[in-house]
Regions:
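Conserved, structured core segments of small domains
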Residues: 2-148
Length: 148
């Protein structure tokens, strides 16, 4: 959220509230067959797109993710090589948007240059609480209502 300063210098929240959205870029390894020049063009297009969003105050710098990784799952804490052992698709990078609506986040995602190469962009609102915490809060509120 942006802040404005009033005449006394106190920070006041601007009228336009922003929500943060996480963009997850999913892709397979389509790029391995491209020439160096083709790769450089795609990289430049993506950097320009992200740079514009950051300059407009709509995004924060994201992170690129390595292909390698591990997955730990279940009660037995099974460890599998790779972030998505059952899939050839991987999350290649992330970007956090700070925009007013999901519709604006979708419009921004639709402009991602990587989509021309069959990448997928998943858009998720960033929440102040995880689903487990939200469920516990809702159940506590329901119990308080019943016991009131």
């Amino acid at each position: 959220m942006s802040k404005k300063h009033n005449q006394t210098g106190e920070a006041a929240m601007s009228e336009s509230k922003k929500t943060s959205y996480l963009l997850l870029s999913r892709t397979d390894e389509w790029y391995k067959q491209l020439s160096h020049a083709e790769l450089q063009k795609i990289i430049a297009d993506n950097h320009a797109w992200v740079g514009r969003l950051i300059a407009e105050g709509k995004a924060r710098p994201g992170v690129a993710l390595a292909r390698e990784g591990a997955t730990v799952s279940g009660n037995n804490r099974a460890v599998l090589d790779g972030p998505f052992a059952e899939s050839k698709e991987v999350i290649g990078g992330t970007l956090v948007l700070d925009v007013a609506t999901m519709e604006e986040a979708i419009a921004i995602a639709k402009a991602c240059p990587s989509l021309r190469h069959n990448s997928t962009i998943e858009i998720r609102p960033i929440s102040d609480e995880c689903p487990l915490e939200a469920c516990a809060r809702e159940k506590a509120q329901a119990l308080a209502t019943v016991n009131a």
